[in-house]
From Swiss-Prot:
Similarity section: Belongs to the UPF0178 family.
Protein name: UPF0178 protein KPN78578_03210
InterPro entries linked to this entry: UPF0178
NCBIfam families named among the record's database cross-references: PRK00124.1 (NF001095)
Amino acid sequence: MAIWVDADACPNVIKEILFRAAERTQTPLTLVANQPLRVPPSRFIRTLRVEQGFDVADNEIVRQCAAGDLVITADIPLAAEVLAKGGAALNPRGERYSEASIRERLTMRDFMETLRASGVQTGGPDSLSQRDRQQFAAELEKWLLAVKRRQG
């Protein structure tokens, strides 16, 4: 089991949580981005740099992740592809995507895109709160514990 990160848009505070967890649990962590990233020296943490372009990092994550892996992303279509492949997906605010929630989120995303295309100002998400960070850490820990139980 491995953790993949859609790293271009992932907040640094979330990356720090992931770095500590990967080292503590000896879980392979790969950050995929189209720009250079700084990561701490660790045999469990690596970066994978991809070409610039629309969905290039997302496509690489989908190509390389396996059933049972965890993907950290706020990208709803990427999360949907990961779930379809048998993986788990968690956003940086600590929301674990499910088959039911992903359909709802895709519908809302499409609706908001339609509004923006028609000129409506929809605004962006709130900044990451302390509660969001705690929720993320708790959900990550749940996934790590479930993996440990499955591996015996």
